From Swiss-Prot:
GO terms for biological process: symbiont-mediated suppression of host innate immune response. Belongs to the orbivirus NS3 family. This is Non-structural protein P8. Pfam families: Orbi_NS3. It comes from the Viruses. The lineage of its organism: Viruses, Riboviria, Orthornavirae, Duplornaviricota, Resentoviricetes. One of its GO terms (cellular component) is host cell Golgi apparatus. It comes from Bluetongue virus 17 (isolate USA) (BTV 17). Its main location: host cell.
Length: 229
């Protein structure tokens, strides 16, 4: 019985050693997953939007600095088109919807500023006329100018000369009002020009998003047709 156990133990040991040798003799494979070979793209690459944006900006900057409002509006339109080419598709759509919501409000503000400027300009003209009349009256009374009527000379009455202090105050007030109106009108002109520029930028951006650049590719700017509203 003991000899049978010893023989069985020896057989198990030999079998275990043989399995161990077979396991060690196996070739190990790297654990990393093999990747397929990379091939260079053979399809023609579409025109890069950032490249087109840089070309548009170069076109805008190649001209001289805009001296008139029309030239400044032109450069703002160029910048908006370049921005539309540079932005991502989703960002373009977000900006387009925001511009459509803001543009009517900007136009309403622009109309209000123009009405305010017209009122201030009319006030400026009235103040200028008042200042001119009071200056002429004060100067005539101070120089004691005599007028000839039917061959007889008529001097300015004394009661009119007594109005010189009041006319001087009116002239001073009209002059001060002219200065205030002129300053306010300049400020309004700057605001109006700025709003006009913003309206031009937003309209140009939306036009760039909507339009299809057939001279660059047959695919619209956003990759799909947009309904023109």
């Amino acid at each position: 019985m003991l000899s049978g156990l010893i023989q069985r133990f020896e057989e198990e040991k030999m079998k275990h050693n043989q399995e161990r040798v077979e396991e060690l003799s196996l070739v190990r494979v790297d654990d990393t997953i093999s990747q397929p070979p990379r091939y260079a793209p053979s399809a023609p690459m579409p025109s890069s939007m950032p490249t087109v944006a840089l070309e548009i900006l170069d076109k805008a900057m190649s001209n001289t600095t805009g001296a008139t409002q029309t030239q400044k509006a032109e450069k703002a339109a160029f910048a908006s088109y370049a921005e539309a080419f540079r932005d991502d598709v989703r960002l373009r759509q977000i900006k387009r919807h925001v511009n459509e919501q803001i543009s009517p409000k900007l136009k309403s503000d622009l109309g209000g500023l123009k009405k305010k400027r017209a009122i201030i300009h009319m006030t400026l003209l009235i103040a200028a006329v008042v200042a001119l009349l009071t200056s002429v009256c004060t100067l005539s009374s101070d120089m004691s100018v005599a007028f000839k009527l039917n061959g007889t000379s008529a001097e300015i009455p004394q009661w009119f000369k007594s109005l010189n202090p009041m006319l001087g105050v009116v002239n001073l007030g009209a002059t001060f009002l002219m200065m205030v109106c002129a300053k306010s009108e300049r400020s309004l002109n700057q605001q109006i020009d700025m709003i006009k520029k913003e309206v031009m930028k937003k309209q140009s951006y939306n036009d760039a998003v909507r339009m299809s650049f057939t001279e660059f590719s047959s695919v619209p700017l956003d990759g799909f047709e947009l309904p023109l509203t």
